[in-house]
Amino acid sequence: MFVKTGDKVKVIAGKDKGKEGTVLSVNAKTNRIVVKGVNKIKKHEKPSQANANGGVVEKEGSIHASNVKVIAKKEDNNK
C-alpha cells in the first residue's frame, strides 16, 4: 500500500476534500485509512466501567485510500 501510518496526506475527493492530516491507522485488507481530523463521525456509546457516563463521542472514521494523496512521508530515523 502506498500510504503508511504517520504519513501526511491531503484528501482529494469526498466531503472533506482539501483537508490535510496525519495517517493514524491503515487497513491494507480493505484499502481504508484513518486520518486525524478528517471524516469525523459521532458514535453513541453505552455507559461502561471505562466511560461511566457514556454519551455521544466524536471520532475519525475511515476513508478509502484512493481518496488521498501523500504530501510528506514519515521520516524514518532507523537508517
Swiss-Prot record:
Any coiled-coil regions, as ranges: none
Signal peptide interval: none
GO cellular component, one term: ribonucleoprotein complex
Keyword Transmembrane carried by entry: no
SMART domains xrefs: KOW (SM00739)
Keyword Endoplasmic reticulum: no
A GO molecular function held by the record: rRNA binding
Biological processes annotated in GO: translation
The entry's keywords: Ribonucleoprotein, Ribosomal protein, RNA-binding, rRNA-binding
Cross-referenced PROSITE patterns: RIBOSOMAL_L24
Pfam families the UniProt entry points to: KOW, ribosomal_L24
Record's subunit section: Part of the 50S ribosomal subunit.
Purpose of the protein: One of two assembly initiator proteins, it binds directly to the 5'-end of the 23S rRNA, where it nucleates assembly of the 50S subunit. One of the proteins that surrounds the polypeptide exit tunnel on the outside of the subunit.
Similarity comment: Belongs to the universal ribosomal protein uL24 family.
Name of this chain's protein: Large ribosomal subunit protein uL24
Organism per entry: Lactobacillus gasseri (strain ATCC 33323 / DSM 20243 / BCRC 14619 / CIP 102991 / JCM 1131 / KCTC 3163 / NCIMB 11718 / NCTC 13722 / AM63)
